[in-house]
C-alpha cells in the first residue's frame, strides 16, 4: 500500500467517478493528513494532472481501454507510470509503449501483482536454487472463477446477480464486455509474468 510508505506523497488524484474520488480522498487524508488536488471533470482531465510539477509518477488503475493511452501520455510528460494489467489490448498498443519509452527515456512498469504472490515467489526461489533442474516446458493461464466479478445485481459489487454493462456496477460495468466481444486471454500477464521470470 503506497499510503503506508513514508517516502510517498499523494499530491493529486484523478477519476471520473465522484464516489471513487471521495473514497480516495478519505483514505489519503487518513494516511497522510493531506488532501490531494482532484481531477476528473472529464475523460481527458488526467492530462492536467500530468502537467503538475509536483507529480513524479502515476499509478494507472482505470478500465483497460485507457491503460495504453494514459501510460503513453504519462511517459511523454516525463512521469514514471505504473499501469495495472493489462497494459495494452493489441499488439500495436504494445509497440506504442515500447516506442514511447525509447523516444522519451521515461520508464513504465506493468503492475502484474501475481509475480509478487508468496506462492509464486516461493517457486521462483526454488527455480533459482535449481531444485527442479533444467526447466524445458511451461504452461500457464488464467485460473480462477470470475463470475462474481463480471456479474452483479447492479447494487453491490462482487456479489449476486447477472447484471453487467450499464446495469452493472464496478468492474462488471466495463470488464464483462471484453469477454463478450473479444476472443482472447485478456489478462495474459497473470500466467506469463511468473513463468517469464522463471525462464529468465
Set out the residue ranges of the language-model regions.
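Short beta->alpha connector loops at strand-helix junctions that form conserved
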Residues: 84-86, 112
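Predominantly a Rossmann-like dinucleotide-binding segment in NAD(P)-dependent oxidoreductases
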Residues: 104-109, 114-200
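Anionic group-transfer/hydrolysis microenvironments
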Residues: 17, 86, 141
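N-terminal glycine-/serine-/threonine-rich beta1-alpha1-beta2 phosphate-ribose binding loop
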Residues: 1-83, 92-107
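Conserved PLP phosphate-binding loop immediately N-terminal to the Schiff-base lysine helix
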Residues: 88-92, 118
Amino acid at each position: 500500500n503506497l499510503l503506508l510508505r513514508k517516502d510517498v506523497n499523494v499530491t493529486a488524484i484523478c477519476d471520473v467517478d465522484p464516489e471513487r474520488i471521495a473514497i480516495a480522498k478519505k483514505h489519503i487524508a487518513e494516511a497522510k493528513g493531506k488532501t490531494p488536488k482532484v481531477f476528473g471533470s472529464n475523460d481527458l482531465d488526467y492530462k492536467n494532472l500530468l502537467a503538475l510539477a509536483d507529480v513524479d509518477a502515476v499509478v494507472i488503475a482505470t478500465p483497460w481501454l485507457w491503460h495504453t493511452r494514459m501510460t503513453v501520455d504519462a511517459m511523454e510528460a516525463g512521469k514514471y507510470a505504473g499501469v495495472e494489467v493489462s497494459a495494452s489490448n493489441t499488439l500495436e498498443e504494445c509497440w506504442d509503449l515500447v516506442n514511447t519509452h525509447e523516444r522519451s527515456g521515461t520508464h513504465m512498469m506493468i503492475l502484474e501483482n501475481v509475480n509478487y504472490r508468496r506462492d509464486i515467489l516461493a517457486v521462483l526461489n526454488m527455480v533459482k536454487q535449481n531444485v527442479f533442474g533444467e526447466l524445458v516446458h511451461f504452461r500457464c493461464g488464467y485460473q480462477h472463477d470470475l463470475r462474481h466479478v463480471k456479474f452483479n445485481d447492479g447494487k453491490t459489487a462482487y456479489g449476486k446477480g447477472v447484471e453487467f454493462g450499464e446495469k452493472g456496477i464496478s468492474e462488471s460495468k466495463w470488464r464483462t464486455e471484453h469477454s463478450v466481444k473479444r476472443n482472447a486471454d485478456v489478462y495474459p500477464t497473470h500466467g506469463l509474468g511468473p513463468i517469464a521470470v522463471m525462464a529468465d
